[in-house]
A protein has these predicted regions:
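Extended oligomerization regions of viral-like shell subunits
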Residues: 13-15, 24-26, 32, 38-54, ...
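Predominantly the C-terminal beta-signal and adjacent terminal strand-loop region
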Residues: 75, 85-129
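C-terminal hydrophobic structural anchor segments
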Residues: 50-99
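Residues on the lipid-exposed face of transmembrane beta-strands in outer-membrane beta-barrel proteins
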Residues: 7-11, 27, 47-51, 89-93, ...
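Transmembrane beta-strands of outer-membrane beta-barrel pores
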Residues: 27-33, 53, 65-71, 107-111, ...
Length: 130
């Protein structure tokens, strides 16, 4: 059995194409009863910034940073001191009215609560509308 709470908020400027970004924030908290790994509480957070119409109309640039939900309290044993961290950056643009292209890079340090678990990746998403 567990209880989970999440809080999300965002703000968007009235005018796009400005240096002022859209801002998204969030935090999560979870508590467990009788978790098989003896975790009794965990928490995580994220912050995202996005800019619209900065280079051309209908494009988006964004970054996101955060910590995935990690154990903050254990019922027995030792709590890990490792602080995992994740990030992402992307640029989305429309070469024409029916295609959207979004290249992105992402990574993380100390994923899975281990100092040896760093990750890095890139992807390209293309959306076609007919």
């Amino acid at each position: 059995m567990y209880k989970r709470q999440a809080l999300r908020a965002y703000w968007r400027p009235e005018d796009s194409g400005t240096a002022m970004p859209e801002i998204s924030v969030g935090c999560d908290s979870i508590s467990f009863d009788n978790h098989p790994l003896n975790v009794s509480e965990g928490s995580g957070y994220f912050v995202g910034l996005g800019w619209q119409d900065m280079i051309q109309a209908d494009d988006r640039i964004g970054i996101a940073l955060g910590q995935p939900v990690k154990a903050t309290q254990v019922s027995t044993g030792t709590l890990s001191e490792v602080e995992p961290f994740l990030w992402e950056a992307y640029y989305s643009f429309k070469p024409n009215d029916s295609i959207t292209v979004t290249p992105a890079v992402w990574g993380g340090t100390d994923v899975e609560s281990s100092t040896d678990q760093d990750v890095f990746g890139a992807m390209l998403t293309t959306v076609f509308k007919f």
